[in-house]
């Protein structure tokens, strides 16, 4: 299973925010500069993460973005569930005439559940704690 760029960049943005010391605020512009992605694309991602409570966005002169809750409580599986369309195949009568007898959909759904259960074992904090090479790459001190 390959994650969409939307989910990939969402995870990257969260990793960047989790890497900042003491819940420091950052900006969408800073995140897009670090990863070299489109600002418009990142705005959509941050908006969805904000609606999900994973990012807190503060408007105004001293505004910015930061994690909406502690990194220790943000499970990677939950982020993927929030950002990723998890339907692997389109099983409807109009697209496939074997849908009533097909068992593939159940197998694929179970595979997705197993994938998410594995991701649920890790938090955002697990991705960033005691990771000096990451801090160096992100230019976070």
Curated annotation (Swiss-Prot):
This is HTH-type transcriptional repressor NsrR. Residues 2-129 form the HTH rrf2-type domain. Nitric oxide-sensitive repressor of genes involved in protecting the cell against nitrosative stress. May require iron for activity. It comes from the Bacteria. The keyword Cell membrane does not apply. Signal peptide: none annotated. PANTHER family: HTH-TYPE TRANSCRIPTIONAL REPRESSOR NSRR, WINGED HELIX-TURN-HELIX TRANSCRIPTIONAL REGULATOR, RRF2 FAMILY. GO terms for cellular component: cytosol. Pfam families: Rrf2 (PF02082). Its cofactor is [2Fe-2S] cluster. Residues 28-51 bind DNA. HAMAP family: HTH_type_NsrR.
């Amino acid at each position: 299973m390959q994650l969409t760029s939307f989910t990939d960049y969402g995870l990257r943005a969260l990793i960047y925010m989790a890497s900042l010391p003491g819940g420091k605020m950052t900006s969408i512009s800073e995140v897009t500069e670090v990863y070299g992605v489109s600002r418009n694309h990142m705005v959509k991602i941050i908006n969805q993460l904000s609606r999900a409570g994973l990012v807190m966005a503060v408007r105004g002169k001293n505004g910015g973005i930061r994690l909406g809750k502690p990194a220790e409580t943000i499970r990677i599986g939950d982020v993927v569930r929030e950002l990723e369309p998890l339907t692997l195949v389109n099983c409807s009568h109009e697209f496939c005439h074997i849908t009533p007898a097909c068992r593939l959909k159940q197998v694929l759904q179970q595979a997705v559940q197993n994938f998410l259960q594995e991701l649920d074992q890790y938090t955002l904090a697990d991705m960033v704690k005691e990771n000096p090479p990451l801090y160096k790459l992100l230019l976070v001190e």
